[in-house]
Amino acid sequence: MFMTYQPKKKQRKKEHGFRKRMSTLSGRKVLKRRRLKGRKRLTA
């Protein structure tokens, strides 16, 4: 077996970053919910 989590900054931003979230309707809903909840960090 090997470790399944191989962190990469670029990949993380591309998949879960602010620009990616803003690009789709559902992503914007995610940001809205996180703002309402009062999250300090909205995205990765």
UniProtKB/Swiss-Prot annotation:
Stretches the record annotates as Disordered: 1-44
Record keywords, A-Z: Ribonucleoprotein, Ribosomal protein
Single GO cellular component term: ribonucleoprotein complex
GO biological process: translation
GO molecular function terms noted in the UniProt entry: structural constituent of ribosome
Alphabetized Pfam families for the sequence: Ribosomal_L34
Compositional bias of kind Basic residues: 7-22, 29-44
InterPro entries reported in the protein's UniProt record: Ribosomal_bL34, Ribosomal_bL34_CS
Family: Belongs to the bacterial ribosomal protein bL34 family.
PANTHER family tied to this protein: LARGE RIBOSOMAL SUBUNIT PROTEIN BL34M, MITOCHONDRIAL RIBOSOMAL PROTEIN 34 FAMILY MEMBER
NCBIfam families: rpmH_bact (TIGR01030)
Official protein name in the record: Large ribosomal subunit protein bL34
Organism expressing this protein natively: Clostridium acetobutylicum (strain ATCC 824 / DSM 792 / JCM 1419 / IAM 19013 / LMG 5710 / NBRC 13948 / NRRL B-527 / VKM B-1787 / 2291 / W)
Encoding gene per record: rpmH
